[in-house]
Swiss-Prot record:
Its main location: cytoplasm. It catalyses: L-threonine + hydrogencarbonate + ATP = L-threonylcarbamoyladenylate + diphosphate + H2O. It comes from the Bacteria. This is Threonylcarbamoyl-AMP synthase.
Amino acid sequence: MSDQSTIAAAITCLAQGEVILYPTEAVYGLGCDPDNQQAVERLLAIKQRPVEKGLILIADNYGQLLKYVDDAKIPMDKRADIFSSWPNAITWVMPAAKNTPKWLTGQYDTIAVRVTNHPTVKRLCQEFGKPLVSTSANLSGQNTVLSIAEAKSQFTEQIGYYVDEPLGGNTQPSTIKDAMNGKVFRG
């Protein structure tokens, strides 16, 4: 478990609109404040990822995601599948709330969300009081970095803080499913 100074340093960077690198269930992720357009644009520039692709939000609990999700549109018969799958490395693509910014959804009217079971990410989201943008720590189309040293070599001074904690132990990135019909996009 991360010590408080590590979490505090990461939270300070997030609050200042910086991008952090942190461990997730399977890979290192790049993250920032989802409500800060400049921070999200900075993250996309670092990753060389087009905004049209949309991003994932990772949270400590579903309540943190409600601002971004049109919860009323999620079919009643899919809710048990969704909520029983969390916390875990399962990302669900849900209808986006009307006010969810396009810098998060890209070209879509949906938002990809996950409630994590990774202790460091849970603490980050708890202390920050909201979800984080979560995208794999790599340049778009390249392999994900496998260590903090590799991340520092690839991203140099572009990252505000490197949360040097262990990965969660999963060997594959999160499964991504459609909350409306259960279809697997990535499994």
